Amino acid sequence: MSLGPVGMSGGMDINSMVSKIVDAERVPKQQRIDNDRTTINASISAYGRLRESLDTMKNLMANFRQEKAFAVRTVETTDDNIVSATATTDAIAGKYAIDVLQLAQSHKVASDVLPEDAKFGPGKLQISLGDDRFNIEVRSRSKLIDVVRGINGAKDNPGVRASVINDVEGPRLILASNLSGKDHQIKVSVEAERGNPLKYFEYQTLEDRVNALEEARAAAEEVLGPLQAPQQPDQPEILDENGNPLPPEAQKAADNAQDDAQDDASQEPISAAGAEAAKAGQEAIDKANQRSSLRPEERIPGWTETASGTLLDSYEEPELELDEKAIEKAPDVPGWNNAASGTLTDSYVTTKEAKQLLEQEKAEIEQKIADEKQELDAKVERGELSEEQAKQIHRAKLDPQERERLEKIDEAEAKIAKAQSSFEEYLGMTEVQAGQDSEVLLDGVAKLSSHNNVIEDAIEGVDLTLKGKSEPNKPPAEIGVEYDRQSVRSDIENFVSAYNSFYQTSQALSSVDPTTGQKGPLAGDSTVRSADSRLKAVFSSRIDQAPENLKSLTEFGITTTRQGTLEINYDMLDRQLNNNFNELEKFFGGNTGFAKRIEDAIHGITGITGSIRTREKSLTEQNYRLNDDQAALDRRMEGLEKRTHAKFTAMQDATGKMQGQLGALMSALG
């Protein structure tokens, strides 16, 4: 309470006198409260430090009790430039040889050099990436950069990136897949008029174009029925003098001779040319018979008995030459080779032949109204009708079945024409980088692949990251999967350090300095002694579930020093880690293992009902009571101050009245 000095004329400072009286009453009680609060807070802080160090040990032991605590793996590689690896706890320890046959890469195609001022469109690009596709509409007179922006900006673009490379000869369009692997191939088809520069952006492999021809051929076959090549009239088989068929070359010569003889015989009974042909045929027969009867040394150059086995196995007889028809047809026959030449060139109907068959049937149908067609053609030449109008008028004269037949023939012819144009007049893009999967040879026997350069679970629990291709003349990279002994070793070291930290902290908090007599905040506290006793009881106990050579902590080289801390004999520890790593879980794990016992002991100290928590709760309650004591003291002192001030004020007033009366009396006595 702030009160101004009153009655200074009487020489009294009431406020100062009241403050001194109140302080004399407050100080001893306030000092007791402050001392108690300091002691309580110091104890709470000390218990907090103990609990923290104990909980560190408890958490370490909780890690040891996890199922896969001792299943962590480490992976090392002999060539990190070729392959790296990561391993899960499921990985089996061992060493594996890795040959990287090829890295995964994305598909990339490029156009030919384009004119600087080229304009594209109108038309449409249909771009495929694997099984996904999207369309790009190209307006008339679009620039190359417009096409690039259209591709890259398409919302449904599954991962095709377009760019322009400025070659020394001019710009090129590059299309690249963002996704690697053989299943992410780029394809581009173009819908545009013939001669449109958009055709430069088409991309089809040779296989695609051949397949298109086959599909067109199949469409023709649907219209015409099973296609068969024109058959040559069968020639009578010619036998040698022993009744055996002649070799092919002799048979062919004899056939030719007979044909010549027959042609000549049609003109005169036996002409000189016929005689010559017959003679030539007989000579071919004789020559074939003679060759078939030759011994090996007579028909195989360089033959000897010593080399007979090799030469007989390896020597190839000269192959027959194809006739002119077969030579002309062979390039159009898929899968043609010399071995199958006779069969394929005779039986296979090419797309060109299918087109001829379609035209032949079409001509046969239209022949019925050939006269009308000539008249309509004349009107088309004069400009009176368009070709399409003439076609419709012409076919209207046919019966419905024939019209339908012609429409199907037209469709088949259109497919053949398109496929042939694509095959023969291809101007599109070329492949500059093949889309391929990564391939790895594991231990020289197992071949693995992935669409990217990460092969998951290449070995159970092991993922491989491929970085480079193995060199042919160098040994394969080797990866080693091992138990993570170093991690377990570090955890054991951390546990020992955590206990030593707890022990040193507890000693500092509960000790008494013999020189000064100063005590720690927990000096004489039984909680500290109880906590240490519990832990050391576990340290010295035996774990029944563990193997015989791992029954106690001392088997790991962990013992108690004279100072009370733990120390590690690293020779013993490393020996156990190297020789008995698979058995460590039996010592630390389980509900009765070492880790669980440590956890239980610490929980009995730091848990909700543990001794430290109980003491902390008690000290906190004492702090609450001190707060109440402080509030009560403050109320009492405030009341004391008011009462004392009132007394001094009343005294001052009484003194003033007495002085007034005394003055009046003195004046009266004069």
UniProtKB/Swiss-Prot annotation:
Name of the protein this chain belongs to: Polar flagellar hook-associated protein 2
Gene that this sequence comes from: fliDP
Localisation per UniProt entry: Secreted; Bacterial flagellum
One GO CC term on file: bacterial-type flagellum hook
GO biological process, alphabetically ordered: bacterial-type flagellum-dependent cell motility; cell adhesion
Residue span of region Disordered: 226-300
Coiled-coil intervals, chain numbering: 342-428
Entry keyword annotation includes Coiled coil: yes
Organism: Vibrio parahaemolyticus serotype O3:K6 (strain RIMD 2210633)
Biased composition (Acidic residues): 257-266
Subunit structure: Homopentamer.
Comp. bias regions, Low complexity: 272-283
Function comment: Required for the morphogenesis and for the elongation of the flagellar filament by facilitating polymerization of the flagellin monomers at the tip of growing filament. Forms a capping structure, which prevents flagellin subunits (transported through the central channel of the flagellum) from leaking out without polymerization at the distal end. Important for swimming motility.
Note: V.parahaemolyticus possesses two flagellar systems: a single polar flagellum propels the bacterium in liquid (swimming), while multiple lateral (peritrichous) flagella move the bacterium over surfaces (swarming). The polar flagellum is synthesized constitutively but lateral flagella are produced only under conditions in which the polar flagellum is not functional.
Keyword list, A-Z: Bacterial flagellum, Coiled coil, Secreted
Ranges of biased composition (kind: Basic and acidic residues): 284-300
